[in-house]
Amino acid sequence: MKQLALCCLLGLGLVAMTLAEDAKNDATRKDRMLLEGTWQVVSMEVNGEKSDPADARKLSVINGADGIWSLRSEGQEVARGTNSLDASKSPKTVDLVPLDGDKKGELYLGIYEINEKTRRLCFAPPLMARPTEFATQTGNQWIFVTFERVKPK
């Protein structure tokens, strides 16, 4: 009898873990779908200093459904890479890895928020800890970017 009860408990535990993993995957899939498309940078802050709004607006990012991103400056690709999301964390986390250039293969840890029209991203340079808030300060070297979705034509 005890063995049957133990088996039932283990079975219920596995079901609960599977359901939790499915919920995590569903939230991440939803965010991945929201992320897909073109996003215009509307503001950027680096290491505690706000970038010139006109310079920030020269930048945009195109995100594919497959996790590939392309950073563009005045329409020209300047970098591309991959991202992996985890919407189950609070704040939600993103790992960014460039696919080319002198930073190829380096891991940038970040956090994000996203909705239909806007998204916020705060990330740290390689080998630094993941940001814990959507802000920068002198000395932390974080990059905080706010985007607006570009409507398809």
What are these regions (language model features)?
Residues K2-K50, T146-K153:
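Amphipathic/hydrophobic helical signal segments and adjacent flexible N-terminal regions
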Residues L127-K151:
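Secondary-structure transition motifs
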